[in-house]
Amino acid sequence: MIVSKPLVFIYRAIAAIVRIFPVKFVTPIQNFVARLVLNFSKERKFLVRRHLNRTYEKNLPAKDSEEKVKKTFQTYARYWVDSARMQGLSDFQIDSGFTVEGFEHIENAWEAGVGPILALPHLGGWEWAGRWLTCRPNYEVSVVVEPQKPRELFDFMVKYRESFGMNVIPLGPEAGKAVINAIKKNHVVCLLCDRDIEGKGVKVHFFGEETTIPAGPATLAIRTGAKIIPVAVYQKKNSHHAVVCPPISSERSGKFREDVERMSQEIVTVLESLIQKEPEQWHLMQPNWPSDFKALKDIRSGRI
């Protein structure tokens, strides 16, 4: 508690500062902080380089690697600054700074009366997808969020999202029921799908290696009839741009588990193409494949 309260205070202070000062003033500071984190986070830097190498299909020239790792940390710093700035923006300002292609896929699914599932990677400004949708007439938005530590910061972020009209569903044992209820109410549900935090997901081939992703999106789609729509939100110079892809087919073609695996693999295949458009905006700084854990063990033991 002693540590967590100052963290919440610091985040509130940062949010207040970025709302006051113009982007051109804040950007050099956020890039400086990104550089500090880069220099003092050996393991994160190592993992980001590995993940970038995957997205470039192991064709990333060594001379370009350092600059692209640096850019990844910079875009991640911008994600946090933009999220803090979002708190002070009106619906008009959000809408003015957001462009989207393929929105008809969300509209068509929503008009069918069963809330669609937006499958997103940790890419660019993913928070803006849900925030922008709250600006649209008639749309209710539910977001599934990962637990954060300390608890006070997590609670603060939940209240922050709820202040925009979002229905926040914490990831956990009761999340499935809550998401099903949201889908039945025709909410647009936002799910991050490129990391299996709980380690109980379905096996897929993702950027050349087998790993797991959450089985939730495919499972929920089969049980409710919801459309799964892959979406990515990219950072642009002074705005954000969303790409909405056609829905993944949720028609049954085999046993339940087989259909979950098939749909999950289709999700991953689309996410790969979305990530490869802007690899340096993929904010995956944790081990995500079995070989990552072995590599981390080697680096900790000094073998790398």
Task: List the predicted regions and their residue ranges.
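A conditional alpha-helix N-cap/helix-loop micro-motif detector
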Residues: S96-T99, P150, I169-P173, E210, ...
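Active-site metal-coordination segments of metallo-dependent hydrolases
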Residues: K45, P150-R151, T211-P214
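Membrane-anchoring hydrophobic helices of lipid-metabolizing enzymes
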Residues: M1-L120, D155-F156, S163
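Catalytic core of membrane glycerolipid acyltransferases/transacylases, capturing the structured
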Residues: A112-P173, G199-V202
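Non-catalytic C-terminal accessory region of glycerolipid acyltransferases
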Residues: I2, F40, K58, A62-K63, ...
